[in-house]
Amino acid sequence: MARKVLGKISLQIAAGKATPAPPVGPALGQYGVNIMGFCKEYNARTANQAGYIVPVEITVFEDRSFTFVIKSPPASDLLKKAANIDKGSGEPNKKKIGKVPRAKLLEIAETKKEDLNASDIEAAVKMIEGTARSMGLEIVD
């Protein structure tokens, strides 16, 4: 018999740095989940992605057990790392703050293709390209 789902929680946590402090503690605490158990497992599974914010989708069951799925880091995070910038431009159409080679966009699209709503890799690259433009990044060949 399938376990009954009590709730689904979506969080964005720094890889390898989950602690019982907010936002993790309050989000899991309201379902009575073992917070430390989640933190240890999450930190172990994301240790290789240090420096990124990693989205996670947690499913909590009626018996207070849980499972979680780790997604790929947000495109904006990957683009910031690729362009060596701290944040996007406040005026993306007027002020360009960095350059990203098209090859790097392809690499980012490959990383994110599982989470993107794209039929093929070219469509995924166009999505990443749009994100780069809206951050004030210039795409170079």
Swiss-Prot record:
Keywords carried by this UniProt record: Methylation, Ribonucleoprotein, Ribosomal protein, RNA-binding, rRNA-binding
PTM section of the record: One or more lysine residues are methylated.
GO cellular component, one term: cytosolic large ribosomal subunit
Superkingdom, natural source: Bacteria
GO MF annotations in UniProt: large ribosomal subunit rRNA binding; structural constituent of ribosome
Record keyword Transmembrane helix present: no
Entries under InterPro entries matching the protein: Ribosomal_uL11, Ribosomal_uL11_bac-typ, Ribosomal_uL11_C, Ribosomal_uL11_C_sf, Ribosomal_uL11_CS, Ribosomal_uL11_N, Ribosomal_uL11_N_sf
Gene3D superfamilies in alphabetical order: Ribosomal protein L11, C-terminal domain, Ribosomal protein L11/L12, N-terminal domain
CDD domains the record matches: Ribosomal_L11
Keyword Ribonucleoprotein: yes
GO biological process: translation
Family: Belongs to the universal ribosomal protein uL11 family.
Role, per record: Forms part of the ribosomal stalk which helps the ribosome interact with GTP-bound translation factors.
PANTHER family on file: 60S RIBOSOMAL PROTEIN L12, LARGE RIBOSOMAL SUBUNIT PROTEIN UL11M
HAMAP family: Ribosomal_uL11
Subunit structure: Part of the ribosomal stalk of the 50S ribosomal subunit. Interacts with L10 and the large rRNA to form the base of the stalk. L10 forms an elongated spine to which L12 dimers bind in a sequential fashion forming a multimeric L10(L12)X complex.
Protein name stated in the entry: Large ribosomal subunit protein uL11
Provenance organism: Syntrophomonas wolfei subsp. wolfei (strain DSM 2245B / Goettingen)
